[in-house]
Amino acid sequence: MKKAVQAKFIKTAILNKDYPIIRSPSGDILPEVAVVGRSNVGKSSLLNHLFEAKHLVKTSATPGKTQALNFFSLNDQIAFADLPGYGYAKVPPSVRKEWGPMVRSYLESRESLKLILFLLDIRRIPNEEDIQFLEWVLYHEKALILVLTKIDKVNQKELRLNTTKILDTLSLMNLHHLYYSVPKNRGRKELMIMIQDALNDEDKQE
């Protein structure tokens, strides 16, 4: 019998001092996975699919409007931080400016952060914001998995061509990546394995 998935919403926070310390029942601090991507890339849908919950992660009616981090736990084993989406054109400039310092503060100071899931829409070539973020992650030597979302929107030829274009644009042909589609129910098992493997590798390095 398949073991039931237990996902829980923990907290919404804006300031570093308000970020929760998420622990296992035995008191150990859980390794944390940050989920990052442009607005409309499908972060909420992917997390709900990953958690096997329809509405645990709320989808904003106005993408990019709320500049806050949402924290979750999965099976009391892994913590997840859903970072606000970036790049939404209709967001006021003042709100857009908040994204950089907030996310940078989280990524630089969060000791429990062990892995970043970087989501990109398979139909979109990475722009300057995407490349800058990836360069920052690599500079700080953070573990990262590239998740190419919305693959149900392209055919097999487009999938191959777009993957090559994306990896070429990022100048990282050997970057760990996988395909994800919520409507096709594709990618969850593979992503969970990659997450666990990455967290195990982090444990060995510490």
Swiss-Prot record:
Pfam families per the UniProt record, alphabetical: MMR_HSR1
UniProt key word Metal-binding: yes
PROSITE patterns the record matches: G_ENGB
Keywords: Cell cycle, Cell division, GTP-binding, Magnesium, Metal-binding, Nucleotide-binding, Septation
Residues that bind GTP: 37-44, 64-68, 82-85, 149-152, 180-182
InterPro entries, per the entry: G_ENGB_dom, GTP-bd, GTP-bd_ribosome_bio_YsxC, P-loop_NTPase
Entry superkingdom: Bacteria
The protein, known as: Probable GTP-binding protein EngB
Organism expressing this protein natively: Protochlamydia amoebophila (strain UWE25)
Gene name for this UniProt entry: engB
